[in-house]
Amino acid sequence: MSLDSRRYHITTYGCQMNKADSERMAGVLENMGYQWSENPDDANLILCNTCTIRDNAEHKVYSYLGRQAKRKHAQPDLTLVVAGCVAQQEGDALLRRVPELDLVMGPQHANRLQDLLEQVASGQQVLATEPIHIVEDITKPRRDSAVTAWVNVIYGCNERCTYCVVPNVRGVEQSRTPEAIRAEMVQLGEQGFKEVTLLGQNIDAYGRDLPGTTSEGRHQHTLTDLLYFVHDVPGIERIRFATSHPRYFTERLIQACYELPKVCEHFHIPFQSGDNDVLKAMSRGYTHEKYRRIIDNIRAIMPDASISADAIVGFPGETEEQFMNTMQLVEDIEFDLLNTAAYSPRPGTPAALWDNQLSEEVKADRLQRLNRLVGVCAELRSQRYANRIEEVLVEDQNPKDPTQVMGRTRGNRLTFFPGNIEQLRGEIIAVKVTEVRSFSLTGEPLSSVATAVR
C-alpha cells in the first residue's frame, strides 16, 4: 500500500479521556503517513475507541464492529483496530467474537500504536492488554479543535466504587510530572490554542503517586499546586479540569479556583446518589452532607459558578425513599447540567453479583422521573443568564445557522451569536444574552475581551 493511499478513520465512544486518547492515536497515525478520512468507507484503517462504562455503550461498539467485519471480507487489506475499555476488558474474548480484528489494545497502550501496527503489518493478530507504565508521548496529537484542547494529567484510578469498571480497564493512577504538563500547555499556547481542560479519571488524585511531601505533611504535587504552576502559560486564556471526586475535593482547591483568573468557574463533581446508605454501598467515601458542603463552599465565593454532576438511579437495593433523597438533592442544588443513568451491571464489579438487583421497569421509571426534575431545575437555573453579559470563547460556526458562531461561557454554557467564524475563531467576545434555554444561550456581540478576567 502506497503512503498516499493510507487513510484512517477513528470512531470514539465514551468519556473525555477516550476523546483525548483518540487525538493522540490520530497523531501517531498521521506521523506514520496516514491521512484522515471523514467517511469510514473510504478508509483502509478503522480504529474504534471503545467505552464499557454502561451496557448500551458496549452494544453500540459491537454493532459498529459487526458492520466493519463484513466490510473486511470484501476488502481484505482493511486494518481493523479496537482500542479503549472494551478492548481491555474483553481481550481474547473480543478476538474470538470478531476474528476479523487485527489489533485489540487497551487504553494504556495508546502511545504504542505505531509499534503494534508494525506487528500487524508482519502478519500477526495482536493483543495488547497487559498493564504497563504509561510513558510520555512526544507525538503531536491531531486535535479536534483549533481553540480548545484536552491535556491528560493523570491516567487510571485507584478508587474501588462497587459499580465501576474503570479501575479494571484503565489501571492504577499514574500522574504526569508538572513539567511535562506545562511543556505541553506551552506548546498549545504557541500553536494558538486558547483553552485547556486538564483531564483525569479522578483528577483530584493528581500527584499522589509522585514523590515528595511538604513541610505541612501533604503531597508536594496536588491539583491545586498544578493549577498555580501552569496558570501563567502564555497564550492560554482559560483552564478547566475534570473529573472531580467529592472525597478529595478540598477548600484549598476552591480557593485556588477563585484566586486564579484563568481557571473557569465550572466544576464537574459527580455525586451519584443523594442517600448515604446507597453511597456507602457504592463505596464512594463521602456523605450527601459533605457533597452539599462542597457546593455551598464553592457558591459562597463564586455565586455564579456552574456545577455539573453525574447521578445513578436504580442501584442494587435502592428503595423508593432512597431514590427520593437523590431527587431532593437535585432539587436543592439546581445543577447546571446533570448526566443521569440507570444502573448497569458491569462484569468484574462487586455490585453486579449482588442479589438485590432492581427490575428494568423500576430503573426506567426512576430515570424518567429524575430526568423530568433535571429539566425543570435546568430551566430555573438558566434564568440567571437573562440579559447578562457573558464572555464567550468562539470555537466554531453554528452548524445549523452559518450566520452564527458558537462558543462557551466561562461556566461552559454553549452560546450562539451572529458573527463570521473566520474573523472570530479563538476570540473571547462579550455577548449580551437575549435568549435563554435550558442548556444553551443566544445573544448579541458587544465587544472583544482582551484577556480572560473575572
UniProtKB/Swiss-Prot annotation:
It catalyses: N(6)-dimethylallyladenosine(37) in tRNA + (sulfur carrier)-SH + AH2 + 2 S-adenosyl-L-methionine = 2-methylsulfanyl-N(6)-dimethylallyladenosine(37) in tRNA + (sulfur carrier)-H + 5'-deoxyadenosine + L-methionine + A + S-adenosyl-L-homocysteine + 2 H(+). Its cofactor is [4Fe-4S] cluster. Residues 143-384 form the Radical SAM core domain. GO terms for biological process: tRNA methylthiolation. [4Fe-4S] cluster 2 binds at residues 157, 161, 164. The keyword Iron-sulfur applies. Its main location: cytoplasm. Belongs to the methylthiotransferase family. MiaB subfamily. This is tRNA-2-methylthio-N(6)-dimethylallyladenosine synthase. The gene is miaB.
